[in-house]
Amino acid sequence: MTIKQLPQYFVCLVFLWACSDNNPTQSVKKPEKEAVEVPDFNADSAYLYIQQQVDFGPRFISSKGWQQCGDFLVKKLKTYTRYVEEQNHPIKTYDGKSHTLRNIIASFSPKKNNRILLCAHWDTRHVADHDVERQNEPILGANDGGSGVGVLIELARLLSKQESRIGVDIILFDAEDYGNPNGDGKGPISWCIGSQYWGNNPHTTDYYAQYGILLDMVAAKDARFTHEGLSRTYAQRILKKVWSEAHRLGYGSYFVYQSTPQIIDDHYFVNTLIFQP
């Protein structure tokens, strides 16, 4: 989680730019959609992937756990697709320390132009500055860092079993949570360094996706997903679609129709740097 924190009972499921349908409204009979067999999402597998990350310990950039977990994630994704790459770039964090950024990208059906983007951050916070005790110690990040990645690895497993009609890119952003605990003031934003870098240097030239979803802190007990401000601005159509499907499946208590303020997270930079309306 980043600059503007939500109350603890909220999670961050936010949406990236969604292309709009600019055709005039008219009564046209749409062809019936062909039924698609959807593989079952295994929640136990997703939780296992979270546990495997936590077992490496804190995973803030340049730490031992970060290096080991990054290697694990790359190896794991390569079992599901041969199109796995890394973005490595030297950076300097707010505290003056030098690091090498490590974004991890896995693509499915890379030649397909019709694509969606799924992303999460894989690093963890280097200080527990929102806890009441041991604030100078790093966190394990089971929820904040591990949960979104766990879900995406399980989705990668499913995508490897059945080719999708559309292409899918999974991006695990680094250094999302290595921001200044005291705030950035008027200086550059010290959070979300991985998404800022990717937004200025996408892994393919002229990158485009129909829409994207960022998963962050999605494993909280009694989680509530709301209509976050920036997501309403950039992807209202996808918000409605996802919430409608969630309610149809019986998950309405988690996907609530409540508008909440905009937050600064990785989706902010993906939207503003890549998918500007």
Regions found by a protein language model. Give the residues of each.
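Sec-dependent signal peptide recognition
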Residues: K4-C12
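C-terminal motif of bacterial Sec signal peptides marking the signal peptidase cleavage site
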Residues: F15-A18
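Sec-dependent signal peptide cleavage junction
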Residues: S20-Q51
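Extracytoplasmic/secreted proteins, especially bacterial periplasmic and envelope-associated proteins
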Residues: S45-D55, Q68, F72-T79, S147-E154, ...
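A non-catalytic alpha/beta surface segment that caps or lines the substrate-entry region
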Residues: L48, Q52, P58-K111
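Solvent-exposed loop/turn segments at secondary-structure junctions
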Residues: F60-I61, P90-T93, K111-K112, W122-H126, ...
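Acidic/histidine-rich catalytic neighborhood of metal-dependent amide-processing enzymes
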Residues: E137-R237, Q262, D266-H267
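Zn-dependent metallopeptidase/amidohydrolase metal-coordination segment
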Residues: Y257-P277
